[in-house]
Amino acid sequence: DQVKIVL
């Protein structure tokens, strides 16, 4: 799985 969080 790939999780990408951009804030």
From Swiss-Prot:
GO biological process, one term: sexual reproduction
Any one GO CC term of the record: extracellular region
Principal subcellular localization: secreted
TM regions (residue ranges): none
Keyword field: Neuropeptide, Secreted
Keyword Secreted carried by entry: yes
Subcellular location: Secreted
Tissue-specific expression: Vitellogenic follicle, fully grown oocyte, egg and internal egg-capsule (at protein level). Not detected in previtellogenic follicles, external egg-capsule, central nervous system and hemolymph.
Function: Has myotropic activity targeting the genital tract.
Record's protein name: Ovarian jelly-peptide 1
